[in-house]
Amino acid sequence: MIIVTGGAGFIGSNIVRALNKIGYQDILVVDNLEKGAKFVNLVDLKIADYRDKDDFITSVRAKEVLGNIEAIFHLGACSSTMEWDGQFMMKNNYEYSKTLLHFCLKACIPFLYASSAAVYGGRTDCFIEEPQYEKPLNIYGYSKFLFDQYVRKIWPKARAPICGFRYFNVYGPRETHKGSMASVVFHLDKQIKAGKPPQLFLGSEQFKRDFIFVDDVAQINLWCWQNQISGIFNCGTGHAASFQTLADTVVAYHNSKPVQYVDFPENLKGCYQTFTQADITKLRTIGYDKPFKPLDEGVTHYLDWLNHQ
C-alpha cells in the first residue's frame, strides 16, 4: 500500500494519478474534506481507501497496524502564504509532519514530503538547498523551513529514504479548490470566461517566478521514490518567467481583452516573493535528467483542460 496525505489536493491528487498510470491502485488517500469541493479530484482516480487526516494521525500515534506500506507521500498541509495563525500552522504543518516522519523511521518506510520555495524568502538569487540561503518571509515558509531543519538532524539515523521537495510555482489541473491560492493561470482564465478583463498587479512584468507544470512535479516524486533518494531538492525548472509572460499566453489563447493592471496590495508588501528561480544542480546531480514542459506548452495544456472538461 502507498499512502498519500493531501491526496485529494492539487499536487497530491496528481501524484495519485501518476501512480495509477504505472499500475498502482492500492493507495490510501488521507485528507480533510471539510470543504467538500476537493472530492472532484478523486472521482477519476483508483484508490483503495480514504481516511480523514485527524483520524489517520490518531491511528499513527496509537501505533495501530496500518498494513504493509511501501511509501508515504506527505503532501497534506496548510499551503496558504496568507495564513498568519502561527499556532494552527505549526500544529498542522510541523508537528503533524514530525509524527509521520517518526512513524516512517521506525517502520523503515520511505518518506517523501512537500517543502516549499517559500523557505528562501525575499532573495533574488542563489536559490540553493543550503541553510545559509534560507530566510522565510511568512509563517507558512517558516513551518516548512523548520521541518527541513528537523529532517537534516534526523538523516544520520535514518534507515529509509527521506526526501523533501521545495516546490516553486506549480500550476496545472486539479487546483480549482484552492480558491485565492490557485495559480495565476487559473485566475486569469476564470476572469476572461466571466467576461471580465484579466488582471495583474502593477509591475508584473518585473515579478518573475519559476513556474513548473504539475505533471513534472509528480514525475520527480515518483522517480525519487523508485530510486530510493534521500535529500532536499528544489522542484522547479531552473528558469524564471514574468507574470506578464504568463498572462500574454492566456490572453492569446482566449483572444481576449488586454490585461488590466491593479495596485499592489498593501498586505502583501514585505512578505511577497518578487523573484524565484530554482537552482536545480542538486536535482540533476542525483541523476534526474528528464526535461521540463516549456511554459507556453504547459499553460496551453492546462487551458485546454480547464476549457474542455
UniProtKB/Swiss-Prot annotation:
Could you tell me what the cofactor note in this record states?
Binds 1 NADP(+) per subunit.
What are the protein's GO molecular function terms?
ADP-glyceromanno-heptose 6-epimerase activity; NADP binding
Where does the chain bind substrate?
Answer: N169, S180, H187, F201, L202, G203, S204, R209, Y272
Needed co-factor(s): NADP(+)
Any idea which positions bind NADP(+)?
A: 10-11, 31-32, 38, 53, 75-79, 92, 144, 170, 178
Keyword list, A-Z: Carbohydrate metabolism, Isomerase, NADP
Listed under catalytic activity are:
ADP-D-glycero-beta-D-manno-heptose = ADP-L-glycero-beta-D-manno-heptose
The yes or no answer to whether the keyword Isomerase is present is yes
Query: Where are the active-site residues found?
Result: Y140, K178
Xref: CDD domains:
ADP_GME_SDR_e
Quote the EC number: 5.1.3.20
The biological processes this protein is annotated with in GO are: ADP-L-glycero-beta-D-manno-heptose biosynthetic process; carbohydrate metabolic process
Domain of life assignment: Bacteria
Question: Which protein family is it in?
Answer: Belongs to the NAD(P)-dependent epimerase/dehydratase family. HldD subfamily.
**Which NCBIfam families is this protein grouped with?**
heptose_epim, PRK11150.1
Its function? Answer: Catalyzes the interconversion between ADP-D-glycero-beta-D-manno-heptose and ADP-L-glycero-beta-D-manno-heptose via an epimerization at carbon 6 of the heptose.
Q: What is known of its domains?
A: Contains a large N-terminal NADP-binding domain, and a smaller C-terminal substrate-binding domain.
- By what name is this protein known? ADP-L-glycero-D-manno-heptose-6-epimerase
Q: Which organism is it from?
A: Hamiltonella defensa subsp. Acyrthosiphon pisum (strain 5AT)
At the highest ranks, the source species' classification is: Bacteria, Pseudomonadati, Pseudomonadota, Gammaproteobacteria, Enterobacterales
